[in-house]
Regions:
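ATP-binding N-lobe of GHMP and related small-molecule kinases
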Residues: 1-119
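DPxDG-like acidic metal-binding loop motif
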Residues: 121-132
Length: 132
């Protein structure tokens, strides 16, 4: 299979609005990679443990819109976190060729962790995993 197999030719069904939720475990690195290259690839390998009781729950609320472009807001524990939005924007741009409907909807991304944010546990990894 090649990447072309994952590019849809067209969608035959659409949804007006809806909500999806997912939960993903976090991890903590014992040996952390240092730096990235290319398309966000690590320069060296890392070793980490999955933390079964530390997870991120993300809900994606969506509704159709008429305007062009990506339209979304990110909330952490009920508060708007615009600082998270550039990472989501980049993710949407990278997957758009496979998910062209992303520009047809306005998204509200609500996320929360079962552990403190910025505590050394990989919340961005579990958050992106739950979103994907």
């Amino acid at each position: 299979m090649t990447e072309a197999h994952f590019i849809p030719s067209q969608y035959t069904q659409t949804l007006e609005k809806g909500q999806l939720s997912w939960e993903a475990p976090s991890n903590i690195a014992l040996v952390k990679y240092w730096g990235k290259y290319g398309e966000q690839l690590p320069k060296n390998a890392s070793v980490s443990f999955t933390l079964q009781n530390c997870n991120t729950k993300t809900s994606l609320l969506f509704e159709e819109k008429d305007s062009d472009g990506f339209d979304f807001e990110v909330y952490l524990d009920g508060k708007r976190e615009s600082s998270f939005e550039p990472k989501i924007q980049k993710f949407f741009e990278r997957v758009f060729v496979y998910l062209p409907f992303l520009k047809d909807y306005k998204f509200k991304i609500e996320t929360s962790n079962s552990f403190p944010h910025s505590s050394g546990i990989a919340s961005s990894a579990s958050g992106m995993s739950a979103l994907a």
